């Protein structure tokens, strides 16, 4: 795994580059640096021209009222610029959605949309079974250019033959980041280099995490291989969700052999084999800031919302890579992990459903196209201003490629049933599941009413 071997092999290869899906990011391209044209083509070249800017909404039917637990940000201004309508927010907590909708509908002040994400609990099924939201099929088409790459996520949210969840984005639950400076200093191939060779697996992660636990002459740690990962971070690469949403029922996979195998593997790294050191488990941010953590699995929001990550980007030491893949299922270049979709449900009795659909399209559009009067070069310049290099942007795009990801509906459900406790104590997954299974199954039955729970 020593880096000089990879460098020697790289010197024997000829430089090549290509656009769009033919672009292969090799070590020598990384050293030479991707051009602005290459990264723009890779990030945005697959999107055809959208008809959204030419869409006309009826007068008096342009405003959209949204029940949400977060501010909808710049998309509100873009929607107003495109359509002349207002986006009106009603803020409340996720757990309040059902009761808030009941009250609003009862009072005759019906919002058009309610935020719904695949990883939140309760999920959209709760709202659908209660008659609080309606199918959105008649109002939105996921063959539109800005929605096309979300079509598989749209289909994943099928419930009783109809679509209730309308996603505007999909991303991994987690990313893996690493400190490239430490890998160079200690002479190891980076996770990205292993990913490029199709060798970035649980076993490779485990080996690097162990070998990069480095002490000085006094026995004090000067480098930790990794801190504590999030729950489900390895399980996602098996392609099996804890509780999988099917069309009309949930499939309980808590005792699925792949889930058992992944959960026990990570628990062993934490406790049985003492690879993830106790000091780095809860305090990885402190050690990361001091340049003492080689790799870390982080929540996806942290990639753009964490001071620790932002600092590493500015310093040029950050690397991004897909999570380690299941060694029994790994395919070179295929990123399998849990994904989470941001989206909305159309509220029963919504006054402006066409405008609601246009707003969903607007958010998706804002992630994929320049704003009015801007260019793709302007979009790239904003990334550069934040310290992102073209090569880091390439890694980011590969790590967030959702084509083979599992849109997880069980992740949020299991969070409320304390699945994360399993990573806090040495345990066996099968034994642990028996302690939470009765309550989990009861909750699923409540969620689905009379709908079948598949074993």
Task: Label each region the model flagged.
Residues 209, 247-280:
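Glycine-centered hinge/linker elements that transmit conformational signals in sensory
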Residues 23-60, 118-173, 203, 321:
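Hinge/lid segment of periplasmic solute-binding proteins
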